[in-house]
Amino acid sequence: MGQIRSILRGIAYDRTESPARVLRRVDQVLAGLQIGSMATALIARIEQTPEQARRGLRTLRWSSAGHLPPVLLRPDAGVQVLETAPERLLGVNATETRSDHSAELRPGDTVVFYTDGLVEHGRTGIDEGVERLTRTLGELQGLPLEELCDQVLGRIVVGRTDDDIAVLAVRCHPQNAG
């Protein structure tokens, strides 16, 4: 996993390519270097056109290699799992293309990314775990980000340490005029 992480960071560092293209390049490097590892990954970036800037909007663009979907929290519309068709893990096939996905972001929106260790444990399947996460996020969505993440971990993890667990939350703030 460490090799894959380093390759991904190196390729993504100064690229303007789409997230799907970055993941495809990682697949190609893994095949070319004959690294026999596989991993899930999700790469995302927040973009903004001049027109979106005038309107205070942004676009979340992401591509997933077998990773769980991000969750979008909207102050005025609740919680939405950004489900997409599943795609293969990194390191499985270097020749197939990957897909980009996008969602419009408004001021106040929060996007939450997480590892499977947060939602999958014991007899709880991934679907149940994601459902629990979305319910929890709905209850906590007005909190400052650090507190939101701490509360999510405190309510869902409950002493488990059998898998890696990570939560990352990004909130869109209103832009300054000028």
Model-assigned labels for residue ranges:
Residues 5-178:
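Conserved subregion of the PPM/PP2C metallophosphatase catalytic domain
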Residues 1-2:
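Conserved long alpha-helical elements within nucleotide-processing catalytic cores of c-di-GMP signaling
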